[in-house]
Amino acid sequence: YAQIAVSNRSDASWGKATPLEISRDTLSSFAHPAISPDGKWLYFVSDMPGGKGGLDIWRVRLIGGTTGGVENLGEPINTPGDEEFPTFRPNGDLYFSSNGHGGLGGLDIFIAKVGADHKFHLEHPGYPLNSQGDDFGCTFEGPHNRGFFSSNRNDARGWDHIYSFELPEIVQTVKGW
């Protein structure tokens, strides 16, 4: 079973890693940690009871050096399938992979944006970010619209490879009075 561990850094040295207690559940896996842009929440993936099924994305409040208040993100993010690999853009957009939402096949990358109603709204960025294979582990280079992701696309053996991408800048020109 996977665990999330924490370690303190002093200059160039890391201290001893210790398991982060998210729950007293010792049978479930806890993996793929991502800290929210405001630093108040740790998002993670788990198969612990109370989810929608498979692997779900959960979050727990970070309070000093401890945690408290575990929450399942629920719908529309979690499904009876697997949701994995959460990561954030600085603007708060949550990127994750799922095989439970309609997509191009296998795990697809999705974007969850918080709308004016304070609820998540999902977007599927389509091809070429997603493919018929498993596409996951999307990460960005800081605030730039470029980054990396993993995929087993175009590999008859099913091996994962790392791909780079750059999202095109969308410019809209409005003319009128």
Residue ranges of model-derived segments:
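Short, conserved micro-motifs composed of acidic
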Residues: 1-177
